A protein has these predicted regions:
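N-terminal leader segment of winged-helix/HTH proteins
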Residues: 1-31, 77, 99
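N-terminal helix-turn-helix DNA-binding core of bacterial DNA-binding proteins
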Residues: 11, 22-64
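Short, locally clustered residues in the helix-turn-helix/winged-helix DNA-binding domain
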Residues: 14, 42-46, 105, 132
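Charged, amphipathic alpha-helical coiled-coil/dimerization segments
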Residues: 70-132
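C-terminal regulatory/oligomerization modules of transcriptional regulators
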Residues: 1-4, 122-140
Length: 140
């Protein structure tokens, strides 16, 4: 059995994952946001929704989501408003929330391009498939 080595592909994958995670957190922390707030902003970027639907989509308890939403409401990133055809009480992004969400999405795209930029479309697809398979194996 081989010893773990800093030259191994797995080591580099772990290192890249940790550095990418840190790079994705940086713009959140600079804006006074917490890890996970971006998931809320991205989900609300699709459309306003009810708190119950948002909690279910993100896999959060309603109590946990309420705490996060209170902070985002205080920072004027989200607002309470009627959503959907039934005009149910819900939550949506403010203009400021949309700008911050777009900035975070742009940052994500830049990191993705740094990773995949030199690859041709078929190579990108194959890499994505291999990483997905590896993740699936690890989840067993």
């Amino acid at each position: 059995m081989s010893r773990p080595s800093s030259r191994s592909t797995l080591y580099r994958l772990i290192e890249a994952g940790q550095l990418a995670h840190k790079a994705l957190l940086q713009p959140l922390l600079e804006r006074g946001l917490e890890p996970g707030d971006d998931a809320i902003l991205f989900e609300l970027g699709r459309a306003g929704t009810t708190e119950m639907e948002l909690a279910a989509e993100l896999g959060l308890s309603e109590v946990s989501l309420t705490t996060r939403l209170s902070r985002l409401l205080d920072r004027e990133l989200v607002t309470r408003q009627a959503v959907g055809p039934e005009l149910a009480p819900g939550i949506a992004l403010t203009e400021r929330g949309v700008r911050i969400r777009n900035g975070l999405a742009d940052h994500w795209t830049q990191l993705e391009e740094a990773l995949m930029g030199e690859l041709k479309p078929k190579q990108r697809k194959k890499l994505g498939e291999r990483l997905r398979r590896f993740v699936d194996l690890l989840r067993l």
